[in-house]
């Protein structure tokens, strides 16, 4: 065992080289410094001070809220999704650099402090609402740089498995697991504009109004033309009516039924002759009114015949778009990109790490 080395060891053969034995001065997360620069240019710190309220008093305020929120967010960006990771990251050079002067001097927050911040301070109603406003305003700052006049909103739900008997977790027959079932809204650029954590056993469209309608109102106040896409879980007349009242165009997958298939009977006849190696695709647009609808709406059908398959693949889309049928289908199919954004959230920033017992604490983490 050698003596403890507190100072860098200088090599005799080359004075420009030094060996440092202090692990606290080594980091593998230097890329976060560039994220911190983006954070500064977008005014993230100002938004935190504007929208979050600090309930602490006295010595408990030694670490500013901005430092705590940055540590929480940056930890996830670097792959440290567990609050327990804060213990070893508190002296990491990168996590000390991204904070205020106090963090550089003292080190970042330890696990107990960061856990209290996430599950108690941010869970307060005012701060929880503030997190939503911070997210919305950050995206607005980016949109202001290169903002198209038309915004496409994609809504979808997903499964987040739970870790035990957590509040409001429940078995979902569709996913065949005990889970939470959040609802999310994305734009074409992959920004998650709005979200809501929900119990595991609710319908995919449950609570759509409180997630979607405020986002539509926000976008229209910015002078944007809003277009909406969603899968068949959102094929509900109340959704069509709400969108039409607000002048929002939409393309929503419609579940097949006998009435719809009778309207396209001529498309379902297999082409005569030897089957083509390439799919044979047919389109048709027509007016259709279900019993639960107050009026008829345009429906676009797509029928595909594939080599080696006995029956055609049939899909229906209810839409208020005025483009031709092929363009409607092509536009709707881009909705699948939203599923990739969800995968990115699960795999890249670990949004599935909702391991707190309390439902509100998990809402904060999401």
Annotated model-derived regions:
Residues 210, 214, 238-241, 245, ...:
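Alpha-helical scaffolding segments of alpha/beta enzyme cores, especially the outer helices
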Residues 38, 86, 328-359, 364-365:
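Short amphipathic alpha-helical "interface-anchor" segments enriched in bulky aromatics
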Residues 3-17, 21, 249-347:
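An anionic, glycine-rich sequence signature occurring as long contiguous blocks
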Residues 156, 225-235:
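Acidic/histidine-rich, metal-coordinating catalytic segments
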Residues 1-201, 206-221, 243-246:
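Dynamic "connector" segments at or just before major functional cores
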Residues 95-96, 160-162, 191-193, 201-202, ...:
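Flexible loop/turn segments at secondary-structure boundaries
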Residues 58-67, 307, 357-366:
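Structural motif
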Residues 152, 225-227, 249:
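Hydrophobic "anchor" residues on beta-strands that sit immediately upstream
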């Amino acid at each position: 065992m050698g003596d403890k080395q507190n100072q860098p060891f200088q090599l005799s053969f080359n004075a420009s080289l030094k060996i440092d034995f202090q692990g606290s001065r080594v980091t593998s997360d230097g890329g976060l410094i560039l994220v911190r620069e983006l954070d500064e240019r977008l005014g993230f710190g100002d938004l935190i001070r504007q929208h979050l309220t600090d309930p602490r008093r006295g010595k408990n305020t030694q670490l500013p809220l901005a430092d705590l929120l940055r540590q929480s967010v940056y930890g996830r960006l670097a792959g440290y999704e567990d609050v327990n990771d804060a213990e070893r990251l508190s002296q990491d050079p990168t996590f000390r650099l991204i904070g205020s002067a106090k963090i550089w001097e003292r080190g970042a927050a330890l696990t107990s402090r960061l856990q209290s911040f996430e599950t108690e301070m941010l869970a307060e109603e005012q701060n929880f609402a503030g997190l939503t406003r911070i997210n919305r305003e950050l995206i607005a700052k980016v949109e202001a740089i290169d903002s198209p006049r038309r915004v496409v909103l994609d809504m979808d739900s997903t499964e987040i498995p739970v870790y035990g008997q957590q509040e409001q977790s429940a078995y979902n027959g569709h996913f065949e697991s005990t889970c939470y079932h959040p609802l999310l809204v994305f734009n074409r650029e992959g920004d998650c504009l709005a979200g809501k954590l929900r119990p595991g056993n609710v319908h995919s469209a449950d609570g759509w109004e409180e997630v979607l309608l405020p986002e539509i109102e926000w976008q229209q106040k910015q002078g944007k033309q809003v277009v909406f896409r969603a899968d068949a879980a959102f094929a509900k007349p109340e959704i069509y009516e709400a969108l039409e009242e607000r002048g929002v165009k939409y393309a929503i997958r419609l579940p097949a039924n006998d009435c719809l298939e009778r309207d396209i009977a001529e498309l379902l006849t297999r082409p005569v002759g030897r089957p083509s190696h390439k799919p044979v695709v047919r389109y048709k647009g027509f007016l259709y009114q279900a019993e639960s609808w107050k009026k008829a709406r345009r429906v676009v059908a797509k029928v595909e015949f594939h080599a080696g398959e006995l029956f055609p693949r049939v899909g229906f889309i209810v839409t208020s778009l005025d483009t031709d049928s092929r363009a409607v289908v092509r536009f709707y199919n881009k909705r699948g990109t939203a599923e990739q954004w969800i995968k990115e959230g699960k795999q890249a920033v670990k949004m599935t790490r909702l391991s707190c017992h309390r439902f509100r604490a998990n809402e904060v983490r999401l």
